[in-house]
């Protein structure tokens, strides 16, 4: 039998709180999603003023980053690369997302624990705020 490490509700709350505070400090609104190692949603927050369509997008970004173990922007870069001729249908799941803003959360050994995603802002800003949530979790992991 094997044991799989994954994010939990406390981790998700830590990330959501950090992103919410950062967004508030800049007067911004977005949707924050945190997924476990399997890509299943642990927590979702839509701040007042964030687009409703960003709920699905943030959830899909979190699923993609968690299940693939890479930033969603990196997947998007592969999709746009003529050299790779990469297609999103490769993933076999309509939740696969190549827009920036989904980041995997890793333990100190590099194993994926889940993901944090933000949607509702331009791609690079989504990713910047997701990185704040990711750092809030990774900074609390045991050595």
Where are the regions that the model predicts?
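Flexible, solvent-exposed loop/hinge segments and secondary-structure transition points
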Residues: 1-143
